[in-house]
C-alpha cells in the first residue's frame, strides 16, 4: 500500500502554481492607476505605480496584523492618500474593487483545467492562496470544492493556519491531504507541519 492510497484531498496553491502571476498583477496595477487618473487625478500626478506599491508596503510593515489581507491593506493605503489630497475616502473601496476585477483575470497554464477536472472525479480539491484571486471569478470557476485565502485563515502562509482551516472544513486528517505548490517555504513547509 502506497502512502498516496490514503489521499482524499488535494490542495493547490494558485499564484505561480496554476497560473503565472506577475503579468496579472502588473496589469491589475496598471488598470488601477488608470482608474486613479480618472477619479483622483491629483493623486495620479503625484504618484507612480512604483511609489504606490512602496507606500502600500510601508503600511503593511507598520501594521503586521493586517498585512495578510492585501485588499484591506490596499484600501487603507488609498484611503490615507485620498484623505491627504482631499478626496472622498469612500472612493478607496471602488478603487480596490476595480483592481480586484482585473486581478481575477488570470490565465491558467494550458493543461491545468483538464487535469483538475480529472482529479475532481476522485478527490476533494481545495485552493489555498495568500493572494486575492477569487477562484469562482476566474477561468477555474466550478473546479474546487473549497477555496481559502489568507483572509479566511487570519494569517498568510507560511503560517499553517490556512492548512488547519482546510483540515477543519474538509474533515480530513493530515495524512489524507496532498498539497501542490511552487514555493518550498510558503507552501511545502507549512503543509508538512500538520
Label each residue range with its predicted role.
Residues 150-156:
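Short, acidic/turn-prone active-site loops that include or flank metal/cofactor-
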Residues 90-150:
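Substrate-recognition element of Asp-dependent hydrolases with the DxDx(T/V) motif
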Residues 156-189:
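Conserved Lys-Pro-Asp/Glu-containing loop-to-beta segment of HAD-superfamily phosphomonoesterases
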Amino acid at each position: 500500500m502506497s502512502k498516496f492510497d490514503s489521499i482524499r484531498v488535494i490542495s493547490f496553491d494558485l499564484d505561480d502554481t496554476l497560473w503565472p502571476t506577475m503579468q496579472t498583477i502588473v496589469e491589475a496595477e496598471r488598470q488601477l492607476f488608470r482608474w486613479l487618473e480618472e477619479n483622483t487625478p491629483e493623486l495620479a500626478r503625484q504618484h507612480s505605480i512604483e511609489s504606490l506599491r512602496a507606500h502600500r508596503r510601508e503600511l503593511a510593515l507598520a501594521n503586521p496584523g493586517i498585512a495578510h489581507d492585501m485588499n484591506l491593506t490596499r484600501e487603507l493605503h488609498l484611503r490615507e492618500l485620498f484623505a491627504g489630497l482631499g478626496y472622498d475616502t469612500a472612493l478607496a473601496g471602488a478603487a480596490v474593487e476595480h483592481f480586484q476585477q482585473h486581478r481575477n483575470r488570470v490565465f491558467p497554464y494550458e493543461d491545468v483545467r483538464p487535469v483538475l477536472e480529472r482529479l475532481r472525479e476522485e478527490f476533494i480539491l481545495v485552493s489555498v492562496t495568500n493572494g486575492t484571486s477569487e477562484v469562482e471569478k476566474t477561468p477555474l470557476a466550478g473546479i474546487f470544492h473549497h477555496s481559502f485565502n489568507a483572509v479566511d485563515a487570519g494569517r498568510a502562509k507560511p503560517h499553517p493556519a490556512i492548512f488547519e482551516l482546510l483540515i477543519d472544513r474538509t474533515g480530513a486528517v493530515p495524512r489524507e491531504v496532498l498539497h501542490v505548490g511552487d514555493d518550498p517555504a510558503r507552501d511545502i513547509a507549512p503543509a508538512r507541519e500538520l
